[in-house]
């Protein structure tokens, strides 16, 4: 379950950080990167 943010970042769903952010500072923050 990956949600693409307006910033260009992504959130890996289902309680996992397995997916790296595709750029985008907000996505990185939400993923805890």
From Swiss-Prot:
Q: Which reaction does it catalyse?
A: L-glutamine + H2O = L-glutamate + NH4(+); L-asparagine + H2O = L-aspartate + NH4(+)
Gene Ontology cellular component annotations, sorted alphabetically: periplasmic space
Supply the enzyme class, top level.
hydrolase
Family the entry assigns:
Belongs to the asparaginase 1 family.
What residues does the Asparaginase/glutaminase domain cover?
1-33
The UniProt record describes its induction as: Repressed during growth on high concentrations of 2,4-dichlorophenoxypropionic acid (2,4-DCPP).
Annotated GO MF terms:
asparaginase activity; glutamin-(asparagin-)ase activity; glutaminase activity
Q: Which PROSITE patterns match?
A: ASN_GLN_ASE_1, ASN_GLN_ASE_3
Give the transmembrane ranges: none
Listed under GO biological process in this entry are: amino acid metabolic process
Q: In the Enzyme Commission scheme, what number(s) does this protein have?
A: 3.5.1.38
Question: What keywords is this UniProt entry annotated with?
Answer: Hydrolase, Periplasm
- UniProt KW Hydrolase keyword: yes
Q: Where mainly located? A: periplasm
**Catalytic residue list:** 10
Q: What is this protein called?
A: Glutaminase-asparaginase
Task: Report the subcellular localization.
Answer: Periplasm
Note the subunit structure.
Homotetramer.
């Amino acid at each position: 379950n990956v949600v693409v943010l307006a910033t260009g970042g992504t959130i890996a769903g289902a309680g996992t950080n397995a997916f790296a952010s595709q750029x985008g500072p907000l996505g990185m923050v939400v993923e805890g990167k």
